[in-house]
Amino acid sequence: MKKILLESEITDSLMPLEPNCEYLVENQQVSYFAVKTNGDLLVTNINNDELNLFKANIDLNRKEIIVFRAGGAGDILFMFPLLDEIKRRFPSCSLTVCCNSDYHFVATNCKSVDKVLSFPIKVKDLPEKCVILNLEGAVEKNDAVPAVDCMFWAAGMARPDSETIKKSLVYTPKEEDVRNAHLIPVAKNKDRIRIGYQWSASSPVRSYPHKNSCELVTKLAQDGGFEVCLLGEPDSIEIGSSPKKGWVYNMTKQGLSWEQSVAFLKSCDLVIGPDSSGIHFAGAMGIKALGLYAPFQWDLRTNYFDSVWCFQQRGECAPCNHHSNNKNGLFPKDKPCSQSGQCEVLATLNPDRVFKKALQLLNK
């Protein structure tokens, strides 16, 4: 990890930072803040002896353990089994998760978490003698190991048995949000199948190509006669024209929060999408889901979810295990996707195959 000191304020809504104040950040985040401040920041390396680092082989009861992870909602979800195991081993410890504020609702859903802090954290706000577990790169550096298992590896802890992990990988939405989910965009019709379709992943390399998605949604609505609810970031989808039959609703226009969007999945009979949070949370809530994979191996993300079935496309350049970030870019260099702006191997997954599998999962 590193310390950064800013000369100017960052007012970014996700990570607002004050000037003349030291923050503790992940190494990979330094470039982000450098861009945000036009280079007006001081970066300081941290020696291991400056921090009280997590060691699983010593007694951490009555200690405050802070677990750092600046990943997305799914990354926080994949931490649940590790957090539960830490609490089982050290029942009297105080367990804190430090993550992006948008995903606090995920961390607080884990029964073992006592407190949540926003990332990045001010150095002066670190509790005295706290124990730090940094999970930066835990998943990204281990492309042959399931994401959940990577968390244990990074913490230096043995992985519990699969059944124990499955019991931890559970997300429980608020009852009020679930009730509201059945009322939007229209009241859920018990005689009509509702499909939640996540239009894209956070990284374009993992997204099912636009043309394929359009064909699939049309088939689901027109041929299947289903209610199809399009999921994604707020205002990220524009519908040009709807199929003549069926019902297609653009949920990105509903003004839902992240937490409400996850709860909305509970109103769906089936969730379809690429390697993304929609598939992961559907699995964590026991909802039937159909994942569309190519850049990453399906079982690295969904192997502990019994309700999820996945297509795995393979080709000369897939799985490529490409993690999109400031350093790596959106797509692997010198590959077809870097020119076309989409995963060409995932594009070979015919929407008709996905449609037929959806019918099978729905017992139609």
Language-model segments: what does each one mean?
Residues 1-364:
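Catalytic machinery of carbohydrate-active enzymes
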